From Swiss-Prot:
GO terms for cellular component: early endosome; plasma membrane; receptor complex. Gene3D superfamilies: Phosphorylase Kinase, domain 1 (3.30.200.20), Transferase(Phosphotransferase) domain 1 (1.10.510.10). This is Ephrin type-A receptor 4a. Its EC number is 2.7.10.1. Widely expressed in the developing nervous system. One of its GO terms (molecular function) is transmembrane receptor protein tyrosine kinase activity. It comes from the Eukaryota. The keyword S-adenosyl-L-methionine does not apply. GO terms for biological process: anterior/posterior pattern specification; cell surface receptor protein tyrosine kinase signaling pathway; cell-cell recognition; forebrain development; negative regulation of axon extension; negative regulation of collateral sprouting of intact axon in response to injury; optic vesicle morphogenesis; regulation of myelination. It comes from Danio rerio (Zebrafish). It is found in: Cell membrane; Early endosome.
Amino acid sequence: IGIGEFGEVCSGRLKMPGKREICVAIKTLKAGYTDKQRRDFLSEASIMGQFDHPNIIRLEGVVTKCKPVMIITEYMENGSLDAFLRKNDGRFTVIQLVGILRGIASGMKYLSDMSYVHRDLAARNILVNSNLVCKVSDFGMSRVLEEDPDAAYTTREITGTYQSQGGKIPIRWTAPEAITYRKFTSASDVWSYGIVMWEVMSYGERPYWDMSNQDVIKAIEEGYRLPPPMDCPVSLHQLMLDCWQKERAERPKFSQIVNMLDKLIRNPNSLKRTGGEIARPNTTLLEPSSPE
């Protein structure tokens, strides 16, 4: 069903003694791996195994006694959220889209309550099951908050990405302070969540379109922000802008985001008002917000 960082991902069936057979996803570690690769591969499972939440991908187990080494998780029929949205462009109601966003926010609230920072939150790292339930996955870059933020990082100024144990840091999803000072916190996850909101409401469009990473960094620094996707309710775009506050202390907490989305779901009329529809403005991004 896909290729992971360490090898292929297959679907299969798991039958544990005394339990019914279930569908699972099986990540394998390709042959010829180093000790460090094996540790990195299995560290994702040890992180996942600590979580128990309906919006976090569930670890079923690992196979380490024989080769290939495997990580077994629940199977998500609809695959990654970005591809799923592109395939179903325009097919969902606003309430369904907000329901998707609420699930993701709920999973992220749980992670932040557990003092976990994901660092790589993006629609491609969210999986969708047959009931449209979304679950946060891909814990290859997650860290416990207490960890020394400098440990795994070497700066790569030229490309505008950072090298980490989990690979390169995705500039267009990452908060400015995380790019510049490697300050990864739940508040930088909130910035990424705002980008995920934009991806969901635009049905999987690429954030900042064809701009280069350097141009994205510069634009954000100058105060530009992504415009509302077509037909996006004003209240949702405002929440995105809140997530993209330059000062991380001013961004909402995931608990507040969950509450706001619940409120919108309870009052569907609050989702009626959409802005003057700009699909893709010539300026590409919103004008910098003028200082009040």
